[in-house]
Amino acid sequence: MQDGLGREIDYLRISVTDKCNLRCRYCMPPQGITPLAHEEILTLEEIFRLVGIMEQLGIRKVRLTGGEPMVRKNLPWLVEQIHGLPGIREIAMTTNGTLFAPQAEVYRKAGLTAVNISLDTLDPERFRCITGCDRADRAAGVDSVLRAIDAALEQQLRVKINCVPCVEMNGEDMEGIAALAADRPVDVRFIELMPIGCGKDYTGISSKEILSRLERRFGAAIAVPGKSPLAVAGRAADPYEETDGPAEYYQFPGFSGRIGFISPISHKFCRECNRVRLTCEGRLKLCLHYDRGLELKTLLRSGALDEEIRERILAAVREKPSEHHFREKAADGGLTD
């Protein structure tokens, strides 16, 4: 499936819920959000039907996101169903990690192949401040996230740790987060803050600045091609796993894993964009920066046949925007260099 610019669209990100067990400051407003009613979100069966249609159109990688995807009941069932589709090569999940460790084996057996775990600090008090978790709730603390990382590795899942650097919240933590890749075959990725939603209220730190700081601490970095550290460690990797999307990776002396940078603001990567997003409300979004999209829930619930849905998806994808304009927003003061 190609868009109007000839970009091959083979990656589908699915938000399975709007709910989350944390209240991260750059993601959720202080007053919280009003959760969607049950009937407003797609059922797991509806999600699977859409994935099946899009697999026939060329989708090869699926990522489950939220909210926090693991608060959605019966999610392993969806993973298992998607895993059974012949064209799907990778099923990944992005999670805050607090609920993952006890379920790691369940998800691996269902067909999960990779997990991205969000972690912005190793300091317990700062973690509570960023995430809004209760001081008494040890199950949702930073230790639970570290257990998730190790549990995922034990299950031979490919692990990426995502960190969003912000001057106001975790500017002092970058070296500690990066050190997680010193003795673990993981990718630690620093993602430039995008000036949308609550993120507009914070100041991100550029990838250039983070790399400079890490080199002062750990030594000169060498740029490396996008190859999974598990493959480097000896595990055979599917060729599709070698495509790491927009991240640029570096190897530091003595590190088992890699350090990556995703720089949507300072280094726009729209020309290589290969993804579309399905919201939990059933809208197919073609770009994060634009609200317009295709309302698939209405089609599903009005009795549309698969062929009609396929044609509507193809028509929408052909209109995928050429690029975002987050950089213009960031020019108002949202990124330090």
Predicted feature residues:
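Radical SAM/AdoMet-radical enzyme domain recognition
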Residues: 41-63, 71-191
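Residues that scaffold the ATP/ADP-binding catalytic core of kinase and kinase-like folds
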Residues: 23, 27, 72, 125, ...
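A short acidic, helix-capping loop that chelates divalent metal ions and anchors anionic groups
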Residues: 32-37, 123-131, 196-201, 295-297
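Glycine-centered loop/turn positions within well-structured domains
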Residues: 22, 124-125, 268, 294
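Conserved, mostly hydrophobic/aromatic
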Residues: 16, 20, 24, 64, ...
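Auxiliary Fe-S-binding modules of radical SAM enzymes
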Residues: 1-11, 179-183, 193-196, 200-337
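Canonical Radical SAM [4Fe-4S] cluster-binding loop centered on the CxxxCxxC motif
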Residues: 4-44, 286
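Conserved G/P- and acidic residue-centered "switch" motifs that form tight phosphate/ATP-binding loops
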Residues: 68
